[in-house]
A protein has these predicted regions:
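Catalytic and substrate-binding clefts that recognize carbohydrates or anionic sugar/phosphate headgroups
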Residues: 1-155, 165-166, 171, 178-183, ...
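Glycine-rich, histidine-containing beta strand-loop boundary motifs that form or position
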Residues: 41, 50, 91, 99-102, ...
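Short, hydrophobic/amphipathic alpha-helical packing segments
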Residues: 64-68, 81-84, 175, 283, ...
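Extracellular structured ligand-interaction cores
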Residues: 82-86, 93-95, 103, 126, ...
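Short acidic-glycine loop/turn motifs at beta-strand connectors
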Residues: 89-94, 257-259, 567-568
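N-terminal small/glycine-rich loop or linker at the start of catalytic domains
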Residues: 150-164, 261-274
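Aromatic- and carboxylate-enriched substrate-binding clefts and catalytic-loop regions
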Residues: 187-494, 529-530
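Catalytic core of carbohydrate-active enzymes
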Residues: 374-375, 380-396, 402-413, 428-431, ...
């Protein structure tokens, strides 16, 4: 059951799509405070949720802020990252969920100030509070997801492997990447283009020197099974003669200063204006700009810098230059030098600059900081709504860096500028179920790490987790070590692990689609699947993938294995990636086990009475188009037989709910397999 309590006059974030809900006179569980709420926690209570954030699956013990922030240092001391996800579940003496529908800053003190107190602070008393009661953790998530609407569904090819780099500078570099993947029998479906494909970092342009025949090049790549995925940034360059800029100024589509003039900030192209994503007309206009690339054969995009990031605001920059002039005439001692460096550092993403510009919304003029968390959401919404108008029957890939709840209906996310640190493998694992709770099913990290220099063993281990993420993308920063998998010594292991991803695609796609269509979770903490197991509640480095699989990736350098907790008897599946993905299986009892895992191996675990549908002929697969989703082999741990609801569709259109897409597969105790649809063949 969901209950609602309204405080003040909330801004309509359009995060909620559910129908009328009973209004609460008094709120259960939470104690009302002057600026928010509190909850007295027992020692065994666990806090789940908050989407993409640092630290563990259990959020207890730290303070988090819902404040979309451009911060590439994902360390334990941070309180906010790129998104705002105000949904949390308390599990313990009471079990309930709550969602705070508010577009500004919300602080979740999860036992940081007082170990036994959850304290939620909302910047203003204008918000909606939803309390969700359910029979289980999964039921609470299900009800919440129905409240906020169906998760985004990408095209099937978007579940393939993507290779990215800041930046592949021209057509020949992209061709080289594709050729090396193909020569080394490594499947690939997409090459991602970073900012240098543009003409001087201007949105919706292509550099004619580097990509002189972009439409022809996109067609050339598509003929090889490769989709180009260009970046779109959140700001428009100030430049006379640039059509997007000219149209935006003429029609008043940009965010403004208090006096009504366009607000000027600086990012990649220098001085820019921010499109007013909360103005419905401006949002529709910005979304329509994607057509220039759709018309050239592009079928996927990624939205970046949409917190929005600010390198500098023009007025602050002027004051800084003036102060630097004064400092240039001084002898800088420790105090003045500290003031000087601090002043320059505070140019970027300064909180006061977010109070200087305004939006024209359906509810009137709003200062940006009061609706800050909606910017990235509505940028991706602009694209999603435009795709509905321009390509109503076709799925287009779109994922974003910044997000808040509501955006999950329009696109996915990647988890931002991580680093080539072993701790960030574990961080990526922690983020997966928390994002799933909030509706963001299509998500994934930068495999191998974006910042810093990676190592071969780190990339291999990261793929050991990444092949189970819906978004599988290797991405790295300019100036760091190149980390395309074919550049490393153990090419056979990389080829095998990527081929394994494609062998698993029938299961991964089926579980993703069922989670999206039924408002469920593709990835969940062990406690959600095994609610009666007290130890499963404590496990922070294992998760369930779909209904059948438990994964426990290795995330420490030089480790040749790890301890794993199994809540029940399971089938251990060991895949020898360097040996054409040879599979070894053995049954393990419930409990704790040390599991050896060599660098060229992937090990996962399968529940008893479950089936795992796999594709065939991994070595022949170059892209998702080569995967036959209708000719399957089954891996089973089913001594008494088992059944599985398998989902498959054309992967391109949007008629997801057709009954014929759901296939009932059974396996009897003698190993005989059959499906109830003639269109799908299975063998045990």
């Amino acid at each position: 059951m969901i209950y609602k309590k309204q405080y003040g006059q909330p801004f309509d974030t359009e995060s909620v799509v559910g129908s009328f809900l009973p209004m609460m006179e008094t709120i259960p569980y939470l104690t009302k405070e002057p600026d928010g709420f509190s909850y007295a926690m027992e020692p065994q209570d666990i806090l789940y949720g908050l989407g993409e954030n640092v630290r563990g699956i259990n959020k207890r013990g730290w303070v988090y802020e819902s404040k979309c922030s451009d911060d590439g240092n994902h360390t334990e001391g941070k309180s906010s990252l790129y998104g705002a996800y105000n949904f949390m579940i308390v599990s313990g003496k009471d079990t309930f969920g709550f969602f705070i529908d508010y577009p500004g800053k919300v602080t979740f003190d999860c036992g940081y100030t007082d170990l036994d107190t959850l304290r939620i602070t909302v910047a203003e008393e204008n918000y909606d509070l939803y309390i969700i009661e359910g029979e289980s953790l999964t039921d609470i998530v299900h009800q919440f997801r129905q409240l906020v609407g169906r998760s985004y569904i990408p095209p099937k090819w978007a579940f393939g492997n993507a290779q990215s780099r800041w930046s592949y500078m021209n057509e020949d570099e992209v061709r080289e990447v594709v050729a090396n993947y193909r020569a080394n029998h490594m499947p690939l479906d997409a090459v991602v283009l970073d900012i240098d494909y543009m003409e001087r970092y201007k949105d919706f342009t292509v550099d004619a020197q580097r990509f002189p025949r972009f439409a022809d090049f996109a067609a050339e790549m598509k003929a090889q099974g490769i989709h180009l995925v260009p970046i779109i940034d959140a700001a428009v360059k100030v430049e006379e003669g640039y059509d997007v800029y000219e149209e935006g100024v003429k029609n008043g589509y940009f965010c403004t200063n208090q006096d009504g003039t366009p607000f000027v900030a600086g990012v990649w192209p220098g001085r820019v204006h921010f499109p007013d994503m909360l103005n419905p007309e401006a949002r529709a206009w910005f979304g329509s700009q994607y057509k220039v690339l759709l018309d050239q054969g592009i079928e996927g995009f990624w939205n970046d810098m949409n917190e929005p990031a600010i390198f500098y605001a023009e007025e602050r920059l002027k004051k800084t230059f003036a102060q630097i002039e004064k400092y240039s005439k001084q002898n800088l001692d420790i105090s003045s030098f500290g003031a000087f460096t601090g002043m320059v550092a505070e140019l970027s993403n300064n909180e006061n600059d977010y109070k200087q510009f305004y939006h024209n919304t359906k509810q009137g003029r709003m200062r940006h900081d009061k609706v800050h968390n909606l910017f990235g959401y509505n940028m991706t919404r602009a694209a999603g709504e435009a795709f509905e108008r321009l390509e109503p029957d076709k799925r287009i890939l779109i994922y974003s860096r910044s997000a808040c709840i509501g955006m999950h209906r329009y696109g996915g996310i990647w988890t931002g500028d991580n680093h080539s640190w072993w701790s960030h493998i574990l961080l990526a694992l922690h983020m997966m179920p928390s994002l799933n709770m909030c509706g963001f099913l299509y998500e994934g990290p930068d495999i191998g790490g974006f910042g810093s220099n990676t190592t071969e063993d780190l990339v291999l281990r990261w793929y050991g987790l990444g092949i189970f993420s819906p978004l599988l993308r290797n991405h790295s920063a300019n100036g760091t070590r190149r980390q395309e998998p074919y550049r490393f010594k153990n090419k056979a292991a990389f080829a095998g692990i990527l081929q394994l991803r494609y062998l698993l695609l029938p299961y991964i796609y089926s579980e993703y689609m069922k989670a999206a269509l039924h408002d469920g979770m593709y990835c969940m903490p062990l406690a959600f699947a095994f609610p009666e197991d007290d130890f499963a509640r404590r496990v922070e480095d294992e998760v369930m993938i779909g209904e059948s699989l438990l994964i426990a990736p290795v995330y420490e350098q030089n480790a040749r294995g790890r301890y794993v907790y199994l809540p029940e008897e399971m089938l251990q599946v060991r895949v020898k990636c360097s040996e054409s993905n040879r599979i070894e299986t053995n049954v393990l009892p419930a409990g704790h086990h040390y599991i050896p895992v060599e660098l060229d191996e992937v090990v996962f675990f399968m529940r008893k009475g479950h089936l795992l549908p796999l594709a065939k002929d991994g070595k022949k697969i170059q892209s998702v188009a080569d995967v036959d989703f209708a000719d399957l082999r089954l891996l089973a741990f089913a001594p008494d037989g088992a059944s599985y609801e398998y989902y498959t569709d054309d992967g391109e259109t949007k008629d997801y709910d057709k009954p014929e897409y759901f296939v009932h597969i059974t396996l009897d105790a003698d190993g005989n397999a059959k499906s109830d649809r003639a269109t799908v063949k299975v063998e045990g």
